[in-house]
Curated annotation (Swiss-Prot):
GO terms for molecular function: structural constituent of ribosome. Keywords: Ribonucleoprotein, Ribosomal protein. This is Large ribosomal subunit protein bL19. PANTHER family: LARGE RIBOSOMAL SUBUNIT PROTEIN BL19M (PTHR15680:SF9), RIBOSOMAL PROTEIN L19 (PTHR15680). One of its GO terms (cellular component) is cytosolic large ribosomal subunit. The keyword Ribosomal protein applies.
Amino acid sequence: MSSKNKIIQELENEQLKQELPEFSPGDTVVVQVKVTEGNRERLQAYEGVVIGIRNRGLNSAFTVRKISHGVGVERTFQTHSKQVESITVKRRGDVRQAKLYYLRELTGKAARIKEKLN
């Protein structure tokens, strides 16, 4: 590793959030997002099922899917972004795959995820 890469790595490590909860695909999470409307800022809660996680250090991201008024809505969040205020795990899901893209095709009761019991 060159010295330039080490410097970049150190700078990225400083910006990583330390107090993140452990969550995995299939979990139902509530993400508090900072929303700026005009000159005021407020928090908006976005609740849904995590359908994918991308672990890339500072560039880590996760995708949350929810059904809003009968329409599926997916939103991708940068894990270490300043816009993401907090992440709360509401329910642990029991799934066997890392990416739950198949949920896009399912509707109603078929799209439910079993709860992890432990």
